[in-house]
């Protein structure tokens, strides 16, 4: 809607809806975005959406993008919806756009894959302390997995599997 450029500081500030495309072809949509060409940082303290090269959607309350390192950082309510409609929620995230790698904490992953669902009522999910996700492997640390449907009053599922490390190999599907 409106933008200002401060030539001495090499800072571009937008007001209202703004769309930015990074060198790695990530699309940032948000408002009140600041591009600091001296510090090589793009950031916003407003709700934003990032679309990656694989069409995964990343929703953030705020973000900082380190241009030279190709890294997005965010703290707050973060949600990723992938192309298979799986949902990942985080409290903190780092995304390396060169390596196509995601590191996050306080992860809640809700899987939509029918291969997990023995019964239509199944709600496969993994909650973990942290996640490292890339094209080859997903590694959940200190995680708990269940297929069970949600229970009233946020009760624990009737069964679950816990592990210090849960590994999913995307290529081998194991």
Which role does the model predict for each range below?
Residues 1-174:
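Structural signature for solvent-exposed beta-strand/loop edge elements and short helix-capping sites
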């Amino acid at each position: 809607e409106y933008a200002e450029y401060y030539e001495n500081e090499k800072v571009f500030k937008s007001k209202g809806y703004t769309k930015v495309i990074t060198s790695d072809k990530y699309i940032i949509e948000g408002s009140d975005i600041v591009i600091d060409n001296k510090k090589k940082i793009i950031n916003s303290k407003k709700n934003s959406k990032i679309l990656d090269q694989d069409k995964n959607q990343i929703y953030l309350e705020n973000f900082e993008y380190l241009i030279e390192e190709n890294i997005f950082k965010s703290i707050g309510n973060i949600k990723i919806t992938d192309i298979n409609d799986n949902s990942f929620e985080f409290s903190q995230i780092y995304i390396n756009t060169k390596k196509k790698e995601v590191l996050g904490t306080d992860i809640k992953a809700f899987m939509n894959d029918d291969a997990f669902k023995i019964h239509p009522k199944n709600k496969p999910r993994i909650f973990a302390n942290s996640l490292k996700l890339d094209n080859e492997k997903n590694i959940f640390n200190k995680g708990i997995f269940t297929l069970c449907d949600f229970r009233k009053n946020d009760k624990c599922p009737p069964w679950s599997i816990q592990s210090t490390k849960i590994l999913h190999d995307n290529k081998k599907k194991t």
